[in-house]
């Protein structure tokens, strides 16, 4: 057996040999080559172009269905066996020995010379106060320096560094920027540019059971300027299975406090204008029967209670509503499902913000889940919507007057919409919070 040649189209490398290969004998061949400067970065093929809703945009039919990219560099090794020539294709990989795990390897990939990761994906502004972002600039090649600029929509102001300098590979530089809108600023996308070109971030996934994964999204974030009215309220939040609704309500300058269920009393609840239960609170709270009784007393004496979705399976109590309702598995998974207003004159549709169909544009992932499918006439349904070819679902938002207060049960996915900066969802939740304002 003889080695005839080794070549790599990615590197414009080709070298001929006439070397005999002996059985089970290692051969180490050392050669130098220059890696072309304009190799494309190793972006997963399905992320190279912007995607549409629910679908990636891939031009090459040969790539569709592949679990990963073709190798960024692949060598063709030709050997002669008798009268036949056999070609082997081998990807370029990096190998090393870990003292615990033994031999490790990962794919050789092409990175941008410099990446810029922003510490947030969405920034939400309810006023003109400045907020801070951190941009981590990393060199993947030595001696990188130049201009760095923040490109932003009209009506926004950005203050921060305009230059960077990195001498060594993997050197990091964390830059602070302060961003603020004027009163007429529109929501939009903020981008980082390096030397006049849109920058990429670099994200990495590392697990023992899969090959290390890296991808390079555009270095950008969504700026959301909320144009809405609020009524000052003191809000208590009873955390359920875990969500970030309370944290995002703080953006609106509400006083909001997470309530502990330990030793909770009706007197404690009456310190709040509004009490909100987190998602699946009555599925996970061990003291649910006692807490539910307190909450209904709180409502009857003038409180405003907002109960976010629970599932009918493994409820800790079924007595957390003032009038009968039946939780189902009804949901609307199409985030753009058309909404029908069932009661335009209801306060939740009008105060302190007038809701329109435009407020239900640009929602993410779904409208909501686990809607009731039967309820007492004491509840007022507010919306109707449905997935394609399904019956209308009217149980997403049910509001009832109970004693001196208001009780709201909702399966609307505020826990998804608020972190995504969906302004219409903020407006709707603000209106629910503002019930019982008299």
Which positions does each model-derived feature cover?
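Catalytic beta-strand/loop cores that center a nucleophilic Ser/Cys/Thr
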Residues: 331-421, 437
């Amino acid at each position: 057996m003889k080695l005839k040649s080794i070549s790599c189209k990615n590197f414009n490398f080709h070298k001929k040999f006439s070397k005999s290969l002996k059985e089970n004998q290692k051969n180490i061949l050392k050669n130098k080559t220059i890696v072309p400067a304009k190799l494309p970065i190793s972006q997963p093929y399905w992320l190279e172009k912007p995607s549409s809703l629910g679908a990636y945009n891939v031009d090459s039919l040969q790539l569709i269905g592949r679990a990963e990219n073709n190798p960024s560099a692949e060598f063709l090794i030709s050997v002669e066996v008798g009268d036949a020539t056999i070609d082997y294709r081998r990807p370029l990989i990096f190998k090393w020995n870990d003292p615990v795990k033994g031999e490790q390897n990962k794919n050789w990939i092409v990175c941008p010379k410099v990446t810029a990761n922003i510490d947030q994906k969405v920034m939400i502004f309810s006023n003109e106060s400045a907020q801070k972002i951190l941009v981590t600039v990393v060199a993947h090649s030595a001696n990188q320096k130049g201009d760095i600029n923040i490109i932003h929509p009209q009506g926004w102001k950005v203050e921060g560094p305009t230059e960077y300098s990195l001498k060594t590979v993997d050197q990091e530089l964390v830059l602070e920027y302060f961003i603020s809108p004027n009163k007429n600023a529109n929501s939009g996308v903020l981008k980082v540019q390096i030397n006049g070109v849109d920058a990429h971030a670099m994200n990495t996934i590392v697990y023992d059971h899969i090959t290390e994964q890296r991808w390079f999204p555009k270095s950008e974030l969504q700026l959301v300027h909320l144009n809405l009215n609020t009524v000052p309220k003191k809000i208590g939040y009873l955390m359920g299975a875990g969500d970030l609704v309370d944290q995002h309500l703080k953006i609106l300058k509400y006083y909001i406090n997470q309530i502990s269920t330990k030793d909770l009393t009706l007197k404690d609840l009456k310190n709040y204008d509004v009490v909100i239960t987190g998602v699946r609170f009555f599925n996970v709270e061990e003291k649910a029967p006692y807490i539910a009784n307190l909450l209904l007393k709180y409502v009857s004496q003038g409180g405003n209670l907002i109960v976010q979705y629970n599932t009918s399976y493994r409820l800790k109590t079924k007595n957390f509503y003032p009038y009968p309702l039946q939780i189902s598995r009804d949901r609307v998974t199409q985030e753009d499902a058309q909404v029908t207003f069932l009661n335009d004159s209801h306060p939740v549709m009008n105060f302190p913000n007038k809701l329109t169909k435009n407020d239900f544009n640009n929602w993410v992932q779904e409208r909501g889940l686990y809607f009731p499918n039967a309820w007492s006439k004491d509840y007022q349904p507010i919306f109707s919507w449905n997935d394609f070819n399904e019956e209308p679902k009217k149980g997403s938002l049910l509001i009832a007057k109970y004693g001196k207060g208001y009780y709201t049960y909702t399966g609307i996915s505020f826990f998804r919409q608020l972190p995504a900066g969906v302004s219409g969802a903020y407006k709707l939740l603000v209106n629910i919070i503002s019930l019982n304002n008299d």
